[in-house]
A protein has these predicted regions:
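Charged interaction/catalytic cores of defense and host-pathogen modules
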Residues: 1-100
Length: 101
C-alpha cells in the first residue's frame, strides 16, 4: 500500500465518521465504521499495532464499577461515546497527517 493509498483510506474513515448521526455504540452504522477502522489500521500498520489496538480497545459506552438497578445511564453513555468518538477521529486525523509528511 502506497502512502497515497494509506492517506486516502484514512481520509475515507474520517469522512465516514461525519455520516454517523446516532451517537450510540449499538448503532449498526457506527459498529460498521469502527470495524472498518480497525481493519484498515491493521492493513496499514499491522495486526498488533498500537494504532489498530487503540481504536479496537475504545469502549464508546459508560461502564460503571457498580450498576445501580433502575438508574438511567443514558447521559453517561452519550458522554463516553462522544469522548471516544472524538478521540478516534483525532487519532485518524493525526495518522493521516503523519502519512502526508
Amino acid at each position: 500500500m502506497t502512502n497515497k493509498q494509506k492517506t486516502d483510506a484514512l481520509d475515507k474513515l474520517i469522512r465516514m465518521s461525519q455520516t454517523i448521526k446516532e451517537h450510540n455504540s449499538d448503532n449498526p452504522d457506527f459498529k460498521n465504521w469502527k470495524y472498518l477502522c480497525v481493519r484498515t489500521l491493521i492493513s496499514i500498520y499491522g495486526e498488533k499495532s498500537s494504532e489498530a489496538m487503540q481504536i479496537a480497545n475504545m469502549k464508546f459506552y459508560y461502564n460503571p464499577r457498580l450498576w445501580v438497578s433502575g438508574r438511567n445511564y443514558s447521559q453517561e453513555h452519550l458522554e463516553c461515546f462522544n469522548r471516544d468518538f472524538e478521540q478516534a477521529i483525532k487519532l485518524l486525523e493525526l495518522l493521516k497527517s503523519d502519512k502526508e509528511l
